């Protein structure tokens, strides 16, 4: 049984907990502690009720600085300094670092110094971590000695498996990406100050361009794609689910049927449970609470001149990513057991 602590109980932290309790992984992963500066009553309430994912299906209550979920007692901590957390005495195997602000090796080492054996970061990190993993593509890179690992981003997890399939079958020459991402908590409800002038504007009233490092994220997972992709991102007034408009130029000649067939076969084979494929006329809310990293919308596949391919990909940027955190943590422990 993997003993896990969650540091940061926001959108991703809560989704990880809920995803675990809805999955078949509870016999292998146990959340024993959550460190969050918010009050326990607020943590309890936001565990029980969620605007995006609905009510939690299991009874939850507070008891003596613990959150009780069924028969499980999860210790609630409120320590701002990770180095002071009681990870050694709690025998923590992996810390899910989900604050969104700790993203390099030096900062994560505080968890190791506090006694945790490994750290899995829930967002893109600096290049000094041991590995950046997109589950389904490169988890085989994990080694026993790795202590700080990044789970990349929701959009990297969405797009990299698809690029990988296209490249192996048709040789990707170059590509351009537009991420159509739901609003996030770094935006304003009404106009208010922010360092990014576009993010001073009300999130519910505009389509807002934001910076993205998605192209660099692709290069980190697929190094041979260096300088082959560019990406832009816009935030839209929805609370969950992201669409990605992917255009790629392929060296090999293709048609719509061939592209869709190859992608569909991948979802039934090596990427089963990670990438999906649909030919149904669906919209973004239909992918809410979908545990997969990416769903290819076959109805939107287009091919121009036999080499330029446009795809539409969907993902639940919270739920799919939370499920990959669980998957990657299991792979980290598996790699560690190979010593």
UniProtKB/Swiss-Prot annotation:
Pathway: Cofactor biosynthesis; pyridoxine 5'-phosphate biosynthesis; pyridoxine 5'-phosphate from D-erythrose 4-phosphate: step 1/5. It catalyses: D-erythrose 4-phosphate + NAD(+) + H2O = 4-phospho-D-erythronate + NADH + 2 H(+). Keywords: Cytoplasm, NAD, Oxidoreductase, Pyridoxine biosynthesis. SUPFAM superfamilies: Glyceraldehyde-3-phosphate dehydrogenase-like, C-terminal domain, NAD(P)-binding Rossmann-fold domains. Catalyzes the NAD-dependent conversion of D-erythrose 4-phosphate to 4-phosphoerythronate. HAMAP family: E4P_dehydrog. This is D-erythrose-4-phosphate dehydrogenase. The lineage of its organism: Bacteria, Pseudomonadati, Pseudomonadota, Gammaproteobacteria, Alteromonadales.
């Amino acid at each position: 049984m993997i003993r896990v602590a969650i540091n940061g109980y926001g959108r991703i932290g809560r989704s990880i907990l809920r995803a675990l309790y809805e999955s078949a992984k509870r016999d292998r992963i146990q959340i024993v502690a959550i460190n969050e500066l918010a009050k326990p009553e607020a943590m309890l309430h936001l565990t029980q009720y969620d605007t995006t994912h609905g009510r939690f299906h299991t009874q939850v209550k507070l008891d003596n600085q613990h959150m009780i979920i069924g028969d499980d007692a999860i210790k609630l901590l409120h320590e701002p300094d990770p180095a002071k957390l009681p990870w050694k005495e709690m025998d923590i195997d992996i810390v899910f670092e989900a604050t969104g602000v700790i993203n390099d090796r030096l900062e994560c080492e505080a968890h190791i110094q506090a006694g945790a054996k490994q750290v899995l970061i829930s967002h893109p990190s600096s290049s000094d971590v041991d590995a950046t993993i997109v589950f389904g593509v490169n988890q085989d890179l994990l080694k026993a000695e790795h202590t700080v690992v990044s789970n990349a981003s929701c959009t990297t997890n969405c797009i990299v498996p698809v690029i990988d399939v296209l490249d192996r079958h048709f040789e990707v020459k170059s590509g351009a990406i537009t991420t159509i991402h739901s609003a996030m908590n770094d935006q304003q409800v009404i106009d208010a100050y922010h360092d990014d002038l576009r993010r001073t504007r009300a999130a519910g009233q505009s389509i807002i361009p934001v910076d993205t490092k998605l192209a660099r994220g692709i290069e980190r997972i697929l190094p041979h794609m260096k300088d082959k992709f560019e990406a832009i991102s816009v935030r839209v007034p929805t609370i969950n689910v992201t669409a990605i408009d992917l255009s790629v130029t392929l060296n090999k000649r293709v048609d719509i049927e061939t592209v869709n067939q190859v992608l569909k076969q991948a979802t039934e084979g090596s990427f089963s449970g990670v990438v999906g494929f649909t030919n149904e006329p669906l919209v973004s809310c239909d992918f809410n609470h979908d545990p997969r990293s990416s769903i290819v919308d076959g109805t939107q596949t287009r091919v121009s001149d036999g080499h330029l391919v446009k795809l539409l990909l969907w993902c639940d940027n919270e739920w799919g990513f939370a499920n990959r955190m669980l998957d990657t943590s299991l792979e980290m422990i598996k790699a560690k057991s190979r010593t």
